[in-house]
């Protein structure tokens, strides 16, 4: 049985990347929350 998580950079960035987050109001909310918390990485 193969494992379910087979990571690929491009699809990951397309769905969870910074540019993608900035497109929606809620995405911007996510980034701002992570910024307020002091996360080193704001998006994937």
From Swiss-Prot:
Q: Which Pfam families match?
A: Ribosomal_L34
Q: Which Gene Ontology molecular-function terms are recorded?
A: structural constituent of ribosome
Q: Give the top-rank taxon of the lineage listed in the UniProt record for this protein.
A: Bacteria
List keywords of the entry alphabetically: Ribonucleoprotein, Ribosomal protein
Fetch the PROSITE patterns from UniProt.
RIBOSOMAL_L34
Q: Which GO terms describe its cellular component?
A: ribonucleoprotein complex; ribosome
Which portions of the chain have biased composition (kind: Basic residues)? 1-16, 24-44
Locate the region Disordered.
Answer: 1-44
Q: Which GO terms describe its biological process?
A: translation
Tell me which InterPro entries the record gives.
Answer: Ribosomal_bL34, Ribosomal_bL34_CS
Which HAMAP family does UniProt cross-reference here? Ribosomal_bL34 (MF_00391)
Q: What name does UniProt use for this protein?
A: Large ribosomal subunit protein bL34
What gene name is given for the protein in this entry? Answer: rpmH
């Amino acid at each position: 049985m193969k494992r379910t998580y087979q990571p690929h950079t491009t699809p990951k960035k397309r769905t969870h990347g910074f540019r993608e987050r900035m497109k929606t109001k809620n995405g911007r909310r996510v980034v701002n929350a992570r910024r307020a918390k002091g996360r080193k990485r704001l998006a994937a």
